[in-house]
């Protein structure tokens, strides 16, 4: 992973100096890898107090970090801004990555902004909105039979011959750097403190890994003490390798056969950084649980009608997880809890249309 001179960073990266900086993730430049960023204004997404939903769940300190308001409609913009910025500085001439949806749109947009061609490899059943988005940004879209793991194998097997700079999840160190800024923003938005609990929808898990890295950096710079938020992984019942590994006490997850879920970002049968995700959950006293597609869609409808947030199914899954953990008493009424909506619901129009038709 990327490392920084945090002693030097601490001298200039202060709350007072942050007040005068641009409201995007590059405000934390001292702990980011590029000096000449390729930016579309990503970051500084709102942290919204969910009072109506919190009242129903018996949670007084419930907040939603709405990453669906990033450029290209998901948190993937953060990682791709950092990765494409650094790839450009390193002289990359062609970028490539597999995707189940939102990462592809983000890569295509930032590659277009940087003036670098890109190849995006998708499962054939990727939602049409994601495919059209990538094509609109000028990407070379390849669609394959299989899952994202098969698409990743295609990139790996062809990148040397084709001269592709591989920006696949955890195949380069920079996407983590962009996504870790979610933790820095939480610290700022919560008045120099962190929440007691974070619930995060987890496929590849880079966002969770990045936030755990940010907490270490923040402690080294003197921003926080040793206490961490309890990190909670939520996955789909149709693809829950991290949950299964957590429950059996394993350090690594097994490949999840026949992965299937409406939440394309959670349909990752084997996360490359599974051991880092599991360590992050266990070291913070966190938890891992799976929810059904039906539960996600019902929670998404409630979130939209009660709080005005049209979430991706992945984001809606965090609402289900919060309800289950609150019911068990694992989350206390007065604790501060942040749910991450990682994407915009508009990209799932087909799924929503089917679900609303069923209702």
What are these regions (language model features)?
Residues 1-359:
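PLP-dependent amino-acid enzyme catalytic core
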């Amino acid at each position: 992973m990327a490392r920084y001179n945090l002693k030097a960073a601490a001298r200039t990266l202060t709350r007072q100096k942050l007040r005068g900086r641009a409201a995007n993730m590059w405000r934390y430049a001292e702990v980011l890898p590029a000096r000449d960023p390729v930016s579309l204004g990503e970051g500084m997404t709102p942290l919204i107090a969910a009072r109506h939903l919190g009242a129903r769940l018996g949670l007084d300190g419930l907040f939603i970090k709405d990453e669906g308001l990033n450029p290209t409609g998901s948190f993937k913009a953060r990682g791709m801004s950092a990765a494409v910025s650094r790839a450009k500085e390193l002289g990359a001439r062609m970028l490539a990555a597999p995707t189940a949806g939102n990462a592809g749109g983000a890569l295509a947009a930032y590659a277009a902004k940087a003036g670098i061609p890109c190849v995006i490899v998708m499962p054939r059943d990727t939602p049409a909105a994601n495919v059209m988005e990538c094509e609109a940004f000028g990407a070379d879209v390849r669609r394959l039979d299989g899952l994202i793991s098969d698409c990743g194998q295609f990139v790996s097997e062809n990148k040397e011959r084709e001269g592709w700079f591989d920006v696949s999840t955890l195949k380069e160190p920079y996407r983590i750097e962009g996504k870790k800024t979610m933790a820095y923003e939480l610290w700022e938005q919560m008045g120099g403190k962190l929440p007691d609990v974070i619930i995060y929808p987890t496929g590849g898990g880079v966002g969770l890994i990045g936030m755990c890295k940010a907490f270490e950096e923040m402690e080294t710079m003197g921003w926080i003490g040793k206490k961490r938020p309890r990190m909670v992984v939520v996955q789909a019942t149709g693809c829950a390798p991290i949950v299964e590994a957590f429950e059996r006490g394993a350090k690594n997850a097994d490949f999840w056969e026949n992965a299937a879920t409406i939440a394309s970002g959670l349909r990752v049968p084997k996360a490359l950084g599974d051991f880092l995700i599991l360590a992050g959950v266990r070291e913070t006293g966190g938890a891992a649980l799976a929810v059904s597609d039906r539960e996600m869609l019902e929670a998404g409808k409630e979130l939209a009608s009660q709080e005005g947030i049209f979430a991706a199914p992945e984001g809606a899954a965090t609402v289900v997880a919060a309800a289950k953990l609150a019911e068990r008493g694992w989350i206390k009424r007065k604790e501060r809890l942040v749910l991450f909506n990682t994407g915009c619901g508009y990209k799932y129009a087909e799924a929503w249309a089917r679900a609303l038709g069923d209702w």
